[in-house]
């Protein structure tokens, strides 16, 4: 295998290589770099402090977001309560005993008429029948 001359790693005589450039700058091999009296900091130290500042800023931002989120949630709950009370509607929560499902009912506060129920009564009837048949037949086994 031939290596062409222009791919050689040998540098011509008299050109400065990396070691000579480092020595001219005063940062030779084995000598630690220190900050000068003008306040220059080595790139590694600057990078470390820059990283610390960014981490600290991210933590502070996350804490402020949590405070805002908590305040926003409290405000939203307050607004929802005001809205529900202003439209004279009520909300009831119960557990259907036969099907074992949670039921939410929205009703008119003054008259007690049911406006909406989740899940619907028809679905509750189906769930009750399913529970009754599966208990007797053993076809479906409920696993949690």
From Swiss-Prot:
InterPro entries found in the cross-reference section: FlaG, FlaG-like_sf
Polar residues biased stretches: 11-41
Domain of life per record: Bacteria
Cross-referenced Pfam families: FlaG
Stretch list, region Disordered: 11-51
PANTHER family per record: PROTEIN FLAG (PTHR37166:SF1)
Family classification: To FlaG in other Vibrio species.
Protein name as it appears in the record: Protein FlaG
Gene: flaG
């Amino acid at each position: 295998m031939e290596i062409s001359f222009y791919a050689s790693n040998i540098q011509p005589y008299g050109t400065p290589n990396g070691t000579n450039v480092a020595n001219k700058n005063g940062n030779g091999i084995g000598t630690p770099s220190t900050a000068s009296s003008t306040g220059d900091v080595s790139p590694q130290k600057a990078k470390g402090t820059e990283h610390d500042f960014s981490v600290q800023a991210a933590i502070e931002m996350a804490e402020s977001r949590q405070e805002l989120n908590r305040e926003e949630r409290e405000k939203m709950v307050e607004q929802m309560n005001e809205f529900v009370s202003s439209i004279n509607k009520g909300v009831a929560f119960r557990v259907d005993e036969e099907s074992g499902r949670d039921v939410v009912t929205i009703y008119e506060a003054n008259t007690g008429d049911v406006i909406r129920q989740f899940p619907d009564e028809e679905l509750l009837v189906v769930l009750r029948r399913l529970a009754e048949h599966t208990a007797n037949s053993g076809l479906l086994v409920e696993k949690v």
